[in-house]
Amino acid sequence: MADAAVIEKLEAGFKKLEAATDCKSLLKKYLTKEVFDKLKDKKTSLGATLLDVIQSGVENLDSGVGIYAPDAEAYTLFAPLFDPIIEDYHVGFKQTDKHPNKDFGDVNSFVNVDPEGKFVISTRVRCGRSMQGYPFNPCLTESQYKEMEAKVSSTLSSLEGELKGTYYPLTGMSKEVQQKLIDDHFLFKEGDRFLQAANACRYWPAGRGIYHNDNKTFLVWVNEEDHLRIISMQMGGDLGQVFRRLTSAVNEIEKRIPFSHHDRLGFLTFCPTNLGTTVRASVHIKLPKLAANREKLEEVAGKYNLQVRGTRGEHTEAEGGIYDISNKRRMGLTEFQAVKEMQDGILELIKIEKEMI
């Protein structure tokens, strides 16, 4: 059971949320007094409480979601809060639904969405994974961070062929290596205020690192927001090649490292927005004509469940009519379906852009 000091902090946090009338987070929407009273004294076997779940959203009242899972068990123990938030964010994934088993499908059915190279600047597909037997960031000890890094770096070092590369630990990284990784847009920084408030950046930079292959088309972030972020990317629009590289990497890593998986929610991640397939397939794409007709762009994107962001990701503007467009759905569908929906949507956007000449 949570101790008195934690419950006192929780009570104060709940009051703060109640008083914040302009707060629009899903946390505020679903943390009713009834749910709060049911969960406030619960504690996972690794010692995580409701405070670990909600503290980022209490601290940052402008959060969109406002909750994180401190460990895998939190998704079950604090389900009365997580489940409605998951249903709201992952539209259509009801509390009675079960996420399907992993299925990359026929990876050869994916194509180059822009063979002429006129529209798509680059293509990227990523997924997140958590290692079984370890909690998520807020509950990890420094020695666990180091132990995980050792397991992951030895696994990655055994990769062969196109995936063969180098692991760079953030601890003791030289200025030259740091600059090189920044120039390649590979280096991740210490977490933003949302992650900081969730206690996701403790013992930084212990256990954190970056692996990339020699061609710079395959990248793994170790212990950033999730235990593993596995990323495949390249210039141009060859989604097929990018997806095939990702799936072969995930399959290789999975042989050596067991991942946290939940019967109902799929692959588990620190943030509930990434659950399920955890897959985000995106392109940087130039659509000057559609950019001038934002309504049409949003209409087509909506039809294919695509998310349209600015050039540099969330909360940024489109520079020179270049957008970051990705699949929005992660839950209740397979990896194959998520990427296929994105491919169909991008092909449709390019077709419309061409017709607008």
From Swiss-Prot:
GO BP terms, alphabetized: female gonad development; phosphocreatine biosynthetic process
Phosphagen kinase N-terminal domain mapped to chain residues: 9-91
Protein residues bound to ATP: 122-126, 185, 229, 280-284, 309-314
Catalytically driven reaction(s): L-arginine + ATP = N(omega)-phospho-L-arginine + ADP + H(+)
Reported pH dependence: Optimum pH is 8.5.
Catalytic activity, EC: 2.7.3.3
Keyword tags: Allergen, ATP-binding, Kinase, Nucleotide-binding, Transferase
Residues annotated as domain Phosphagen kinase C-terminal: 119-356
Enzyme category, top tier: transferase
Organism superkingdom: Eukaryota
Keyword Cytoplasm found: no
Binding site for L-arginine: 64-68, 225, 271, 314
Activity over temperature: Optimum temperature is 30 degrees Celsius.
Function: Catalyzes the reversible transfer of high energy ATP gamma-phosphate group to L-arginine.
Record-stated family: Belongs to the ATP:guanido phosphotransferase family.
Name assigned to this protein: Arginine kinase Met e 2
